[in-house]
Curated annotation (Swiss-Prot):
TFIIF is a general transcription initiation factor that binds to RNA polymerase II and helps to recruit it to the initiation complex in collaboration with TFIIB. The gene is gtf2f2. Its main location: nucleus. Heterodimer of an alpha and a beta subunit. Keywords: DNA-binding, Nucleus, Transcription, Transcription regulation. This is General transcription factor IIF subunit 2. Belongs to the TFIIF beta subunit family. One of its GO terms (biological process) is transcription initiation at RNA polymerase II promoter. The keyword RNA-binding does not apply. GO terms for cellular component: transcription factor TFIIF complex. It comes from Xenopus laevis (African clawed frog).
Length: 264
């Protein structure tokens, strides 16, 4: 993420606005996102019980119905628990703040090319809490459905009564497999011959051309690649860079080119 600095609005700090930092269950946040109209999602209740503060949240009834679980449509009607008591926690000596930002020049990918016009400090966290579902039949049913959906295989096999020919026609074997099997069969036919015979074939080839790649030498000698490389290491040099990169040539002591004969 690339972000450019903008103005910092500290009105929230000046007003000493207290904020609550509350951890929500994932399903509850998803239900909140479905709120329409004024965006009212429920009611927050704060009471004093024997000098102790008790906080609970009640979800609106119209948001309690779950249409999908884990990104998949729910197979049956499932309702979330509506009652959620808060577990209050201390801030623990930390100074936590809530910031908001307004962006411009933002691309479709929100993680890139972010330009922050304005950064505002809305307030300071004075309470931390965890919003937990109350134990109920709805909650147990929802968790049971989540477990059932997560245990279903992502892909299922299905037996077709007739062949699908709209896109691909069935074949006994694919061309790639045919070529691979042919190559494998040809390689198996390459039986090792005497080393001196291979050397004769190699010297004869290098009299015609100075450089060869390994594929051409395999075609010429009809020898397995590993066996051929063992022999080439004795008489040849493998070029790893330059104009003739990835090719073999004879070592100087084995060369008998016409140009060298004239220079001698």
């Amino acid at each position: 993420m690339s972000a450019e600095k903008g103005e910092l609005d500290l009105n929230g700090a000046k007003q000493n606005t207290g904020m609550w930092l509350v951890k929500l269950p994932k399903y509850l946040a998803q239900q909140w996102a479905k709120a329409t109209g004024r965006g009212e999602v429920g009611k927050l209740r704060i009471v004093k019980n024997q000098g102790k503060t008790e906080v609970s949240f009640t979800l609106n009834e119209e948001l309690a119905s779950i249409q999908d679980i884990g990104g998949k449509p729910a197979s049956s009607l499932v309702s979330t628990p509506r009652e959620h008591p808060f577990l209050l926690q201390s801030v623990g000596g930390q100074t936590l703040t809530v910031l908001t930002e307004s962006l411009s020049g933002q691309s479709e990918d929100k993680s890139e090319n972010r330009v922050i016009d304005k950064l505002a400090l809305e307030g300071i966290v004075v309470h931390r809490a965890e919003c937990r579902p109350a134990a109920s039949d709805n909650y147990m049913q929802m968790k049971r459905k989540q477990i059932e959906e997560s245990s279903k295989p992502k892909r299922q096999s299905q037996q077709l009564e007739k062949a699908v020919t709209s896109n691909y026609k069935p074949v006994s074997n694919h061309q790639y497999n045919i070529e691979y099997e042919k190559k494998k069969k040809d390689d198996g036919k390459r039986a090792r011959v005497d080393k001196h015979q291979v050397l004769d074939m190699l010297f004869s080839a290098f009299e015609k051309h100075q450089y060869y790649n390994i594929k051409d030498l395999v075609d010429i000698t009809k020898q397995p690649v590993t066996y051929l490389k063992e022999i080439l290491r004795d008489i040849g040099i493998y070029n790893m860079k330059g104009t003739h990169k990835n090719t073999w040539e004879l070592k100087p002591e084995y060369r008998h080119y016409q140009g060298e004969d004239k220079s001698d």
